[in-house]
Amino acid sequence: CIIHGPHEKHLTNYINGFRCQKCTPKSSVEYEILNLIPSSTINNRTFISPLEIDILSEKFKFGIEYNGLIWHSYGKSSYEVLNNLSKLDKNKHSNKTNMVEEKGFHLFQIREDQWLNPIKKEIWKSIILNKINQSKRIFARKTYVVDLSNFPKLIETFLNENHLEGFTDYDICYGLIYKNRIYSIICLSKNDSEWELKRFCNFRGYLVVGGISKLFTTFEIIHKPTSVITYANRNWSSKNIYGILGFNYIEYIEPEPEWFNPKNNNFIRVPNDINIKNNDLYNNGFRVFFGCGKNKFKKVYK
């Protein structure tokens, strides 16, 4: 493989067109995900024709895209199909999500490195199982709220193990406790007079019915905000939950470039003002990936 070097491959796989397993592990992963979802189809080419959806569940009204990093990114390469900077389109994934949402469905876009990470893989499984009503349920009325703000290590561990974006800075954090275990967490920070809802997540495999409403209402009663904003990652989030809390949609935020080394799929931090189409990162083998952007919501109190 031009990207990953020499590797062994069974003759049958070669005949069937399967190349380097680091570049094209997609098929086996798709079937792994497919097995989680009853009555779903793979490689649907009719729902948003001519584009394809990797996995589609018409019963539960959602689809899943598995985005291999090599084939869904842009960069320079001696391999012609990967030498694709001239075709750079930062809205490619976002546009597909738009097409699915126009049909009244929700689209999850799973990034390859997330599925290959054992913890994030379990988070994704939890998200999918929740979508098909297979999560274990706890009713918020059976829980009680605790202020966790002074327990940063506990919060960090919970977020890293249960939220795809992991830990973030915060000013306050509340949790829901049931039988001496934390099942939900909400984190907010304050900038001048405006608050931001930065994280909410449940314990993997569980859905706390009414949990986010109970936590957010607690915050409102104690802190009496004048306004709260939040940003929803369109790779997995839907608009519905924010409407329940009284938020209004404000705007769509375009996806930011995410840079990674294709030899190990490690992402790096890069200054925001870097030239996307012309920089030394490409010459050093790095590639750029674009997600689906974010939706901004705001709640204003009168």
Q: What feature does the model see in each segment?
A:
Residues L148, S189, F200, V300-K302:
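Structured loops at beta-to-helix junctions and adjacent beta-edge loops in soluble globular domains
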Residues I2-I172, C201, Y206-K239, W259-F267:
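Nucleic-acid endo/exonuclease domains
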Residues I55-F60, L176-K179, K299-Y301:
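Active-site beta-strand termini and strand-to-loop segments that position acidic
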Residues N248-P262:
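Conserved catalytic-core motifs of GNAT/GCN5-like acyltransferases
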Residues G175, N180-E196:
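Conserved beta-strand in the GNAT
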Residues N235-Y252:
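Conserved active-site alpha-helix within GNAT-family acetyltransferase domains
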Residues F260-Y282, R287-K302:
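C-terminal "cap" of GNAT-fold acetyltransferases
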